[in-house]
Amino acid sequence: MILANDELKRLISTGRLKVDPLYPDTVRENGLDLRIGGEYAIYAYESTVVRPCDLETAKPLFRIVKSDEVVIPPRNFVLLTTEEYVKMPDDVVGFANLRSTLARYGLVIPPTIVDAGFEGNITIEVVNESPNTIVLKRGMRFLHLVLAKAEGRAQYSGLYQGQRGVTPPKGLKGEC
C-alpha cells in the first residue's frame, strides 16, 4: 500500500520517519521530494577496465566534486546524494524515482529501493542519455521517493547504513 501525504506527515510527526532537513514542499501527494546535496561523484578515469569482483572498494575510481552545480556530460553518469538525511521506519520501503521533468531532459535512474530501516543520505545513480551536457543545481528537487507499507518488520544492516554524503559503490570482492 502506497502511503499518501497524510500518513507521511503522521509518520514524520511521530518520529518514525525522519527527513532532515524537512522543507515545506518535501511531502507530496504520494511521496517525498528530495533535493540534490552539495557534492557528487563522477568517474575519475575513462576507458578503464572495472572488475567489481576484484575490488574491496571502488572509491579510487571516482572523483568527488563539491559544488553548487552538477555537470553531467552527454551519455555519462554521476552519483548524486540527497541533501536530506533520511531514516526509514522498519516497516516502510521506498521506491526512488527521478522527477518527471528531469526525465524529459534525458536523465534516467535505475530502479532503486530504499530498504525498510535504512538510515542515511541517499546516493543515486543519474544517467544522462541525451546528446547534451546537463547542469543541475544544488538544492533542487530531483528525487521522488514513494513509500509503501511492508508486511512485517525488517532490520536493515546493509553496507550503506548511516552513509553521509555521496558514497561510491563498495567492491564486490568476496561476493563473486
Curated annotation (Swiss-Prot):
InterPro entries: dCTP_deaminase, dUTPase-like_sf, dUTPase_trimeric. Pathway: Pyrimidine metabolism; dUMP biosynthesis; dUMP from dCTP (dUTP route): step 1/2. The active site is at residue 125. SUPFAM superfamilies: dUTPase-like. It holds the Pfam family DCD. One of its GO terms (biological process) is dUMP biosynthetic process. It catalyses: dCTP + H2O + H(+) = dUTP + NH4(+). DCTP binds at residues 99-104, 115, 163. The keyword Lipid biosynthesis does not apply. Its EC number is 3.5.4.13. Homotrimer. Catalyzes the deamination of dCTP to dUTP. This is dCTP deaminase. It comes from Pyrobaculum arsenaticum (strain DSM 13514 / JCM 11321 / PZ6). The gene is dcd.
